[in-house]
A protein has these predicted regions:
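Short N-terminal strand-loop motif that marks the start
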Residues: 1-24, 167, 299
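Glycine-rich beta-strand-centered segment in the early N-terminal region that forms part
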Residues: 12-53, 91-93
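NAD(P)H dinucleotide-binding glycine-rich loop of Rossmann-like/cofactor-binding domains
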Residues: 49-126
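Mid-domain Rossmann-like dinucleotide-binding core that forms the NAD(H)/NADP(H) cofactor-binding site
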Residues: 95-172
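Glycine-rich cofactor phosphate-binding loops and adjacent beta1-alpha1 units
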Residues: 115-117, 162-237
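Residues in the short beta-alpha loop(s) of Rossmann-like NAD(P)-binding domains
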Residues: 152, 220, 246
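C-terminal hydrophobic helical "lid"/dimerization subdomain
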Residues: 202-206, 247-299
């Protein structure tokens, strides 16, 4: 469960009734012979459903991807029927606690893929939440230089424990000046902004170099209205793009986990039993930004 799932519990903007949760692993109980899946096989589920596979013929530039747990019923149940294309077998070397982050890794892969980066480029990441730290780890793997910015010292410490060398706390340092020092005066070529990170977007123009690229990533569900001075964006001729899902990147995400590229230690805050959800959710909702991932054990 994530902060988005908690927002659904709180009654924010979802089309009810709906079953939340978009990340799940499980065991195959039944499978068609043509599916390639085996009974008892450990799998991770993709929440992405392509609404119209013929979108290109209709002139659309990007596919309309629905997300289970947000646009339709999700995975918070003890049994679910899934199409084979949404079911991915897990290699033996991937632990359950790592596999549960496949969806967020896929989103981070797609987000960085939307940028035309080159080795050695600086990438400022606004928010040291789970997605932000995963994106920073990927930056290192791609030989980029991540700079993670957050007001939460605990989250920054977690980022540092994951090998992120440059972290900035705006309450302790001038963000722009610190990035100038880190980049040798260039500022960041790229900035990733995840609105659910609880960071404000007003840093974007001041930390991104002229002509740089900004990617707004994550889900646009349950967000408050965010304000960004477009005059500053125009003045610096910033390129702005958006990535709201990891559709098409699940195999890459699994491969990254299998090769130990992504370290998920510290991302899971607690594990609760399925029968305890009604009691635990009110406690979690009191400060959903304090939580990375809450795992629900349905066994």
């Amino acid at each position: 469960m994530s902060s988005t799932d908690v927002a659904i519990f709180e009654g924010k903007k979802a089309s009810y009734p709906i079953i939340p949760v978009r990340s799940a692993i499980g065991l195959v109980s039944e499978a068609h012979a043509m599916s390639g899946l085996k009974k008892g096989e450990r799998v991770v589920l993709s929440p992405y459903v392509l609404d119209d596979p013929f979108y290109k013929k209709k002139g659309a530039l990007v596919p309309d991807v629905k997300v289970m747990g947000l646009d339709m019923d999700g995975f918070l149940c003890d049994f679910i029927s899934m199409p084979p294309e949404n079911v991915y077998p897990l290699p033996e070397g991937i632990k359950d606690n790592d596999a549960i982050f496949t969806e967020q890794i896929a989103l981070a892969v797609k987000s960085l893929g939307a940028l035309e980066t080159e080795r050695g480029d600086y990438v400022a990441i606004l928010g040291a939440n789970t997605l932000g730290i995963i994106a920073a780890e990927l930056c290192i793997y791609y030989q980029l230089v991540p700079i993670v910015i957050d007001v939460d010292e605990t989250k920054l410490s977690l980022a540092e424990n994951h090998g992120i060398y440059y972290t900035i706390n705006p309450s302790k340092a001038d963000v722009r000046q610190r990035i100038i020092e880190i980049t040798g005066g260039k500022l960041a070529e790229f900035t990733l902004y995840e609105p659910r990170s609880n960071m404000l977007p007003n840093y974007i123009p001041s930390i991104t170099q002229e002509g740089g690229t900004v990617a707004v990533i994550g889900y646009n569900y349950f967000l408050s209205n965010l304000q960004l001075n477009l005059g500053d964006v125009l003045e610096k001729q910033l390129n702005v793009t958006a990535v709201k899902n990891g559709y098409g990147e699940f195999n890459t995400a699994i491969n990254l986990l299998a090769n130990k590229v992504i370290n998920t230690e510290g991302f899971i805050d607690s594990v609760i039993k399925f029968d305890d959800i009604d009691r635990e959710l009110p406690r979690i909702s009191e400060d959903k930004y304090a939580y990375g991932k809450v795992v629900v054990d349905c066994m």
